[in-house]
Amino acid sequence: MSFYRSWIGGTGDLVKKYTSSIKDDVELAEEVVRVMKGHVAHLVEIGSIPKEAGERIIKALEEVDASELLKEEFEDVHEALEKWLIDKLGEEIGGWVGLGRSRNDHVAAAIRLAALRKTERLKEEACRLRCALAKRALEYADCPMPSFTHFQPAQVITFGHYLLAIDELLAEFLHILRGVEDLLNRSPLGAGPAGGVRTPLDRRRLAELVGFKEVVENALYASGSRFFALALASAVVSFLAELSRAVDDFIRWNSPVVGYVNSPDSHVSTSSIMPHKRNLVTLEVLRARIAEALGHFAAMSALVMKVGMGYSLDLQEATRHLWAVLNIATEGMAVFRDFIENMAFNCEKSRKDAEAYFTTSSDTAEDEALKGVPFRKAYFQLASAIKAGTARLLTINEALKRPVYGSANTEEVKRAASRRLALCRPKPL
């Protein structure tokens, strides 16, 4: 029987399993223990519990194996931890841990801390991917290829330039994550169930003991809001949606019909009946899981938006969707990085296509305009010449000598990739 529920009556296994979050709490069990240690230490500091009792509780918390708390008989890991302490130390000692706290503020704190830990891992993976992209961008700085708009051959670029576009996405993602971290790194402890507690906690000192930088001021918002979780999931899902576009490109380019990408053997599978197939299954799964991440974010939003400002168990259900989004992103970036590090790009084929599909036409028209011909006139003259088969276009090497910052100019790509690589040694970014 669950510890708290025993005071109002028992329940059957069906209901107990249905409402318990214990399986999902594996994601934050260590943070729950960390929060409890800080809470008890502060209770001792302010003299609200006997010093000896507090010291014994903290010693026990240092010994507990968080994984041992994850038993189905409990509603959640918070209940399991309190019961474990009382069983180990007796009610006269362990019973003090309920003072000045609610599961509402403690679970919010644990989620924030676990999210910070997972965000740090996410940032590390993003930095590793950036370094892999920069290395390959330098390698392919002078490898021409068509860019595609409307999935039609457009302006000539290089594969190195393409890879640096993904790198810039990651740079912006990391910038957003740093802002979200500031939101996460605020303590709800001391907020109690909704309006604070009678115990004279110093909420800023308590935040410091647990490892938070700031405090969420309003107690109702501190315990009941999940805006921080939505903000993090939104940032991650927005990044994944954009990354999926590159994933889709590589899947298309892996087809021998296009023939741009030679995928590593470890990333491909074949057909059960067509032995010639080389299906890029890792990126297909990544593309699918990105779609799942969007679904998890939609579920989070739907769960939160119909709940009043105070805590409801609906918010418990929202948390597992946050973990799913973060895990999909972290694992997916690792897989994508391995692909980038080990794939090969067919520069001969991509150059051939760039030459065949008039990908220097815009540069040719611009050149004519810069020589004194009104651009639209030069544009229509070139269009007529292309249609007639008489166009004299700039070569790829000539077209790529664009002088603007951030262009596909080979030297510009090399400089940008080299700057990025310099940040990767010896420690990524």
UniProtKB/Swiss-Prot annotation:
It is found in: Cytoplasm. GO terms for molecular function: argininosuccinate lyase activity. The keyword Lyase applies. GO terms for biological process: arginine biosynthetic process via ornithine; L-arginine biosynthetic process. It comes from the Archaea. Pathway: Amino-acid biosynthesis; L-arginine biosynthesis; L-arginine from L-ornithine and carbamoyl phosphate: step 3/3. SUPFAM superfamilies: L-aspartase-like. InterPro entries: Argininosuccinate_lyase, Fumarase/histidase_N, Fumarate_lyase_fam, Fumarate_lyase_N, L-Aspartase-like. Keywords: Amino-acid biosynthesis, Arginine biosynthesis, Cytoplasm, Lyase. GO terms for cellular component: cytosol. Its EC number is 4.3.2.1. It catalyses: 2-(N(omega)-L-arginino)succinate = fumarate + L-arginine. It is an enzyme of class 4 (lyase). HAMAP family: Arg_succ_lyase. Belongs to the lyase 1 family. Argininosuccinate lyase subfamily. This is Argininosuccinate lyase. It comes from Pyrobaculum aerophilum (strain ATCC 51768 / DSM 7523 / JCM 9630 / CIP 104966 / NBRC 100827 / IM2). The gene is argH.
